[in-house]
Amino acid sequence: MNINDKIGIYPGTFDPITFGHLDIIKRACKLVDKLIIGVAENVNKHTAFDTKLRTSMAENEIKGLGIDADVISFNGLLVKFAKEQNASVIIRGLRAVSDFDYEFQMSWVNYKLLPEIETIFLPASEDTQFISSSFVKEIARLGEDVSKFVSKGVQNELINLNRIKNGE
């Protein structure tokens, strides 16, 4: 790692990590010298999986794909985390216009807090543009196959989660 290397942060809740997230991660790696996947510990957002497991799932997914990136959990302001990691860019994926509205507002706030950190938006690929962690969890909760949206390892975690919730 060189002192002049461009470090990017791809933040998210990753509850769970999906093929859509992995698509953005693969593409983001081409844009920066080092990518950090920031697993957000968001106290205002109820997650199905705890931060440790979400971080572990992300680590397993990128390792399985041979992606050279770090996975680090964080809480608090994203721009503060980015600054702590010496990142110069935040990378966000966009699925639909509704994502853009929210993400554009957040990028403005982040810019006001730390103007030296830029935000890059990557549109979702056509085959992943409508995958969301919420949809995946609901489909899995109903006992349906989610293999088109997440890896086998994540599927197994969803099955375990639903067994626990159902008292099995």
Curated annotation (Swiss-Prot):
<feature type="site" description="Transition state stabilizer">
    <location>
        <position position="21"/>
    </location>
</feature>
<keyword id="KW-0808">Transferase</keyword>
<dbReference type="GO" id="GO:0004595">
    <property type="term" value="F:pantetheine-phosphate adenylyltransferase activity"/>
</dbReference>
<comment type="function">
    <text>Reversibly transfers an adenylyl group from ATP to 4'-phosphopantetheine, yielding dephospho-CoA (dPCoA) and pyrophosphate.</text>
</comment>
<feature type="binding site">
    <location>
        <begin position="93"/>
        <end position="95"/>
    </location>
    <ligand>
        <name>ATP</name>
    </ligand>
</feature>
<feature type="binding site">
    <location>
        <position position="45"/>
    </location>
    <ligand>
        <name>substrate</name>
    </ligand>
</feature>
<feature type="binding site">
    <location>
        <position position="78"/>
    </location>
    <ligand>
        <name>substrate</name>
    </ligand>
</feature>
<dbReference type="InterPro" id="IPR001980">
    <property type="entry name" value="PPAT"/>
</dbReference>
<keyword id="KW-0067">ATP-binding</keyword>
<feature type="binding site">
    <location>
        <position position="13"/>
    </location>
    <ligand>
        <name>substrate</name>
    </ligand>
</feature>
<comment type="pathway">
    <text>Cofactor biosynthesis; coenzyme A biosynthesis; CoA from (R)-pantothenate: step 4/5.</text>
</comment>
<keyword id="KW-0460">Magnesium</keyword>
<keyword id="KW-0547">Nucleotide-binding</keyword>
<keyword id="KW-0173">Coenzyme A biosynthesis</keyword>
<dbReference type="Pfam" id="PF01467">
    <property type="entry name" value="CTP_transf_like"/>
</dbReference>
<feature type="binding site">
    <location>
        <begin position="13"/>
        <end position="14"/>
    </location>
    <ligand>
        <name>ATP</name>
    </ligand>
</feature>
<keyword id="KW-0548">Nucleotidyltransferase</keyword>
<comment type="similarity">
    <text>Belongs to the bacterial CoaD family.</text>
</comment>
<comment type="subunit">
    <text>Homohexamer.</text>
</comment>
<dbReference type="InterPro" id="IPR014729">
    <property type="entry name" value="Rossmann-like_a/b/a_fold"/>
</dbReference>
<feature type="binding site">
    <location>
        <position position="103"/>
    </location>
    <ligand>
        <name>ATP</name>
    </ligand>
</feature>
<feature type="binding site">
    <location>
        <position position="21"/>
    </location>
    <ligand>
        <name>ATP</name>
    </ligand>
</feature>
<feature type="binding site">
    <location>
        <position position="92"/>
    </location>
    <ligand>
        <name>substrate</name>
    </ligand>
</feature>
<feature type="binding site">
    <location>
        <begin position="128"/>
        <end position="134"/>
    </location>
    <ligand>
        <name>ATP</name>
    </ligand>
</feature>
<dbReference type="GO" id="GO:0005524">
    <property type="term" value="F:ATP binding"/>
</dbReference>
<keyword id="KW-0963">Cytoplasm</keyword>
<dbReference type="GO" id="GO:0005737">
    <property type="term" value="C:cytoplasm"/>
</dbReference>
<protein>
    <recommendedName>
        <fullName>Phosphopantetheine adenylyltransferase</fullName>
        <ecNumber>2.7.7.3</ecNumber>
    </recommendedName>
</protein>
<dbReference type="InterPro" id="IPR004821">
    <property type="entry name" value="Cyt_trans-like"/>
</dbReference>
<dbReference type="GO" id="GO:0015937">
    <property type="term" value="P:coenzyme A biosynthetic process"/>
</dbReference>
